[in-house]
């Protein structure tokens, strides 16, 4: 929902989902509203959570308080709730109410750092999937040597039939066109090697579907995980099991690399002086975003009849702010759902 008056975008925040409590979502919202994490549109927030937990925190962030409404929800989805339990017993939770308001059109999108399985189950139940799409996929934008690429599925569907992987390719292309601005995105299929004999039966069958598709999906072929970050494809398709491992590994390696660099640079007087220069020029100019995995937080549940963005449960305020920014970015791409339906129908 992008309102004409000042292009204001409405976003629902599940304040109870983050591992570190409601302040993650509220401080993250403050970073967006203050411009510390800039968005292209003005943002108005609906914040969902338990009054006793949220209001004391909200009172500390006057800018958020001024640009939001608070909705008291007596329950919350827990990190160990099974999806089936959440569907039956968490209908008054902050997560449920936020997504339900997306369905009603009260807000344009919902952002949650809560239980992934419950979020997917509740979103599918309340919003449903787009016509022709069997299951949603978790998709995000990751950095590469050539810029960025879209990766999906990152954990929603551990096992995927070949036809589902083909749908992910179509969805990923539409997403890449919308958020990366690539007119004819190149699609790769994640595998353990480039040879025809490599990979599981489902991967090999998905390869054949993508290669022989009626419409040209600009299929690159198999992509190894190390090649994905070289930028050989604009979209990398995977089953949720492999995709999630790839994502978590790259995040861990990025964190380890920064840790080692900082340790080595700061081990000498000259190194510490160089670090101060870096902080005063490069990091001030770029916000260090290229080296900070928090700037890539926020994965879209792609294929739903509505916009839901998943933040890492362990996210801090900066990471959560980037998840809000991702929601705003997707809202502004109004024709993406129609494009997915059209391409899946023609596949």
UniProtKB/Swiss-Prot annotation:
Record localization: Cytoplasm
Single Gene Ontology BP annotation: phospholipid biosynthetic process
Which reaction(s) does its UniProt entry say it catalyses?
Answer: a fatty acyl-[ACP] + phosphate = an acyl phosphate + holo-[ACP]
A GO molecular function assigned to this protein is: phosphate:acyl-[acyl carrier protein] acyltransferase activity
Which species?
Answer: Anaplasma marginale (strain Florida)
GO-annotated cellular components: cytoplasm
Write down what this protein is called. Phosphate acyltransferase
Q: What is its main location?
A: cytoplasm
UniProt xrefs under NCBIfam families: plsX
Instruction: Supply the alphabetized keyword list.
Output: Cytoplasm, Lipid biosynthesis, Lipid metabolism, Phospholipid biosynthesis, Phospholipid metabolism, Transferase
Q: What is the gene name?
A: plsX
Its annotated pathway? Lipid metabolism; phospholipid metabolism
Q: How the protein assembles, per its UniProt entry?
A: Homodimer. Probably interacts with PlsY.
Q: Does the keyword Transmembrane helix apply?
A: no
State the family it belongs to. Answer: Belongs to the PlsX family.
């Amino acid at each position: 929902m992008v309102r004409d008056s000042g292009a204001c975008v409405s976003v629902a925040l599940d304040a109870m989902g983050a591992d570190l409590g409601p302040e993650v979502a509220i401080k993250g919202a403050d970073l967006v509203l203050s411009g510390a994490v800039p968005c292209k549109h003005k943002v108005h927030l609906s914040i969902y959570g338990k009054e006793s937990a949220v209001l004391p925190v909200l009172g500390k962030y006057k800018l958020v308080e001024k640009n939001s409404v608070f909705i008291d929800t007596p329950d919350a989805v827990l990190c160990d709730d099974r999806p089936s339990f959440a569907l039956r017993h968490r209908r008054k939770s902050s997560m449920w109410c936020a997504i339900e308001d997306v369905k009603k059109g009260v807000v344009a999108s919902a952002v949650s750092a809560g239980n992934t399985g419950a979020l997917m189950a509740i979103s599918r139940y309340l919003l449903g999937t787009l016509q022709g799409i069997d299951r949603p996929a978790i998709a995000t934008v990751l950095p590469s040597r050539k810029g960025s690429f879209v990766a999906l599925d990152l954990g929603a569907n551990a096992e995927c039939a070949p036809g589902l992987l083909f749908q992910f390719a179509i969805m990923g292309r539409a997403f890449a066109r919308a958020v990366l601005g690539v007119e004819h995105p190149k699609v790769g299929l994640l595998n353990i090697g480039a040879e025809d004999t490599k990979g599981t039966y489902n991967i090999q069958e998905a390869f054949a579907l993508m290669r022989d598709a009626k419409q040209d999906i600009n299929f690159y072929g198999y992509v190894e995980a190390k090649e994905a970050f070289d930028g050989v494809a604009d979209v990398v398709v995977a089953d949720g099991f492999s995709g999630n491992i790839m994502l978590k590994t790259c995040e861990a390696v990025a964190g380890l690399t920064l840790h080692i660099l900082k340790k080595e640079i700061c081990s000498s007087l000259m190194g510490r002086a160089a670090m101060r220069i870096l902080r005063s020029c490069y990091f001030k100019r770029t916000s260090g975003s290229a080296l900070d995995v928090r700037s890539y937080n926020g994965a879209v549940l792609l294929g739903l009849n509505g916009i839901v963005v998943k933040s890492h449960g362990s996210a801090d305020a900066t990471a959560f702010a980037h998840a809000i920014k991702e929601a705003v970015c997707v809202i502004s791409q109004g024709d993406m759902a129609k494009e997915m339906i059209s391409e899946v129908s023609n596949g």
